[in-house]
Amino acid sequence: MTRLFDLDHAERTAEPLSVRIPLQVARHEAVHEHHGWAFTTWLDPQMAALQAQAIAVALTELAPASEVAFNQRLKELEQRLQQLDRNLEATFATLGHRPVVFSHPVYQYLQARYGINGRSLHWEPEIAPSTRDWIDLQKLLIDHPAALMVWEGEPLADTRKKLADQGIDSVVFEPAGNHPEGGDYYEVMERNRRQLLKA
C-alpha cells in the first residue's frame, strides 16, 4: 500500500511548510519567469527541520509503536540542522549586502533564509555561455554590480577566466539535489561553506 503525505499542511506547524517562490532569471531584455516553483527547500535548514517534523508525524501514524525512536532521531536531526543553520548564517553574514549572481535559479530558499542580495541567470557550469548569455550578464550588472557568481557545479575554466577578467569571482555551492559521490548532505554543506569563506 502506498500513502502520500502532504508536507505543506502538517498539523505541527502554524504556517505552511513551503513558501513557494517563483523561479525568476535574468533573460535578455527583461526578467523572465519560468513556470513552476523553487524546489530546493533543503537549502533552508529551518524549513528542512519543519519538513522532518511533518515526516516524523506521518511515520508515527504508520508505526505508532516506534514513536519514541522516531522522536529521538528527529531530535538528533533537528540539532544537526540547527548547527548547520547557525554556521551558514555566520558565513553568509560575511557577504553583507554585496550583490551576488547565481548561475542557476535553484537558490531561492537559501537566498530568502539568509537575506542574500542575489539575482539569477540560467547558465550551466559545463556549457560555455553564449554571446547572448554574456550580454544578459552585462545588463544584469548595470543595476546589480556583483563581484561574486555562485555556481551549482565547477564552471569551465574559460568561463571562470572570463568572469575573473571582469572582476567576478566564481564559487561553487552545490545544491545537493542528488546523493553526493562522497560524504553526505552535511559534508556537502560544510564544503560549500568553506568555499564561500574563501570568496
Provide a role label for each language-model segment.
Residues 1-199:
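Extracytoplasmic metal-acquisition and chelation regions
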